[in-house]
């Protein structure tokens, strides 16, 4: 059985060699990227089970990310497998400003009182912490007395005890001992801040990614609050001639949860970004929302990626904790299409081991989906011919113990709909366009491949059998299910045929 749950692996310096030096060694960042050595490390991740690589534009400039993308193309050649390319936007965010005296951080103790400035363009001091807010917003009027300001992923909490309208500053009191570092993330739960739908930097980053050789296949849009946030990115993709790029809305706050249905409808999929979500909403609700989101996205037949802190301890340790293993396992049982590695593979000590561990857990968990899974295919929409065929394919595969479904698909939609039903079989998606092929890398159970478009219906079924045999997924004498649209090029799926491989 092949691994059907996909892995999104974030790339960063952990797998990159510069001037013969590894990340963490003295002088590393002063050296040029060694493309060949780095590509071999990335190829190793592909061999261990990475299906999609994530380029996190919260870190690194365009030259760095462009070189990283080019290195992945070389890694594909070494590994002999293609992967998907996912650009993750920085998104609208707040961070602490630099300190006026050049300090990296200041220490505070419980009960310390000081101020937080909402005016933009200031520098921090021990008495006044300045904020850098996306879009240059002044958030003074958006935050109420009694709310909590969280710094550095919630490591430090500040109670907002007063507001000074004359200076537009917050009066705050430290809830615990901690430090305030420069350029650390700031969250204010239960607050609706009127960020622009798309920050200027995100617009530039997206256009840069789309312009790279080979382009990108997925965009993860950070801090999506409404469907309009997704539509803004869709507009850029269409404007630049990239309507095929799939958009994953990152659900990270209460507003995103409240508007979940409209966001799912507007996007091609959802990324459950549990890091910021765990700060923006009550932490005990994170697993509840994870199950809710996965269930809704499964029903819609779209992509769902579970992300953040999945194997966090492997950033520093060669083995995951038992709770982390359970976390990955349960995400698969919940119905996720893919699980994601962040710091573990981007800047951790054990990127290859992290991918291997996640692949092992994913593969084990998928064998128990039928017994423990939370899918309810009987509730899925069956109002179209393609939906009915997709449901029938799953039933036929299970009734006849068929291990391979071959879907000939121009847009990828047929394979996605079959994947939605989680059949106990691999789904070999035969496409005729590399963009479609790469766009299927993230879907559960789908093994995409590309070939020449058949010229007739008879040729179509012959091609399906030939490609299936060449893939090594079946042998002569095995039964396969072939799903396609007849006649060729109709753009709709209306035919299911069970065929014995010659």
Curated annotation (Swiss-Prot):
Substrate binds at residues 54, 275-276, 308. GO terms for cellular component: cell surface. It is an enzyme of class 2 (transferase). The record marks 250 as: Transition state stabilizer. The keyword DNA damage does not apply. Belongs to the pyruvate kinase family. Pathway: Carbohydrate degradation; glycolysis; pyruvate from D-glyceraldehyde 3-phosphate: step 5/5. It comes from the Bacteria. Mg(2+) binds at residues 252, 276. It catalyses: pyruvate + ATP = phosphoenolpyruvate + ADP + H(+). GO terms for molecular function: ATP binding; kinase activity; magnesium ion binding; mannan binding; potassium ion binding; pyruvate kinase activity. The lineage of its organism: Bacteria, Bacillati, Bacillota, Bacilli, Lactobacillales. K(+) binds at residues 56, 58, 88-89. ATP binds at residues 56-59, 95, 184. It comes from Lactococcus lactis subsp. lactis (strain IL1403) (Streptococcus lactis). This is Pyruvate kinase. Homotetramer. Keywords: Allosteric enzyme, ATP-binding, Glycolysis, Kinase, Magnesium, Metal-binding, Nucleotide-binding, Potassium, Pyruvate, Transferase. Its EC number is 2.7.1.40. SUPFAM superfamilies: Phosphoenolpyruvate/pyruvate domain (SSF51621), PK beta-barrel domain-like (SSF50800), PK C-terminal domain-like (SSF52935). InterPro entries: Pyr_Knase (IPR001697), Pyrv/PenolPyrv_kinase-like_dom (IPR015813), Pyrv_kinase-like_dom_sf (IPR040442), Pyrv_Knase-like_insert_dom_sf (IPR011037), Pyrv_Knase_AS (IPR018209), Pyrv_Knase_brl (IPR015793), Pyrv_Knase_C (IPR015795), Pyrv_Knase_C_sf (IPR036918). Regulated by phosphoenolpyruvate substrate and is allosterically activated by ribose-5-phosphate, AMP and other nucleoside monophosphates but not by fructose-1,6-bisphosphate. Its cofactor is Mg(2+); K(+).
